[in-house]
C-alpha cells in the first residue's frame, strides 16, 4: 500500500484502511470520541493489541490528523470482539460514520489495561492524548507537508 500520509519512510509501523462504523459511543461519553473501524483480526497479521499514537487520513482529504489508536478487546468494558478505534485530535465533533479512513500506527504506547472505573480510564486517556501531542511536536520536523498536527487548537 502506498504511504498516503507523506510520512517519512519507516515512520509508520503498520497501516490499515476501513470504513467507520457505529460503536457503543463510550469514547464520546468520556470526552474522547472515536472512529470505530470494522476489521477481522484473522484477515492478516496485525500488530500487538494495545494503544498507539498514529496518523489518520479520511479518504478525499489531503491532510492527516494525529490520533490515538486502540486495537483490542477493551478489558474495562468488554465487548468480546476485537476492535480498532481512533480518537482524532482536533476532530472531536465531526460525524465520520460511513467514511473511509486510513490509519498509520506510528508509536506503541502501552498494552490494554483493565481500569477500576471509567474515571480512571478517562484519566489514562488524558495521559495518552498528552503522549500523542508530545510525539507530534517531537516529530514535526520529520513530518512532511499535508499533515495538520493540531487542527482547531492554539
What residue spans do the PLM features occupy?
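Phosphate/ribose-recognition catalytic cores of enzymes acting on nucleotide-derived substrates
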Residues: 2-154
